[in-house]
């Protein structure tokens, strides 16, 4: 499905991709999950 985008649509599409990319860094859920992962790794090493 290679539909030609108008420059305007293409611009919007790029903004959507960029926003999605940025929001993936700002997701508190993902950040918390990473934090939990680190805590678990430290616990396994014997650090509380």
Curated annotation (Swiss-Prot):
Pfam family, any one: DUF2740
The name this protein goes by in its record: Uncharacterized 5.8 kDa protein
Organism, as annotated: Escherichia phage HK022 (Bacteriophage HK022)
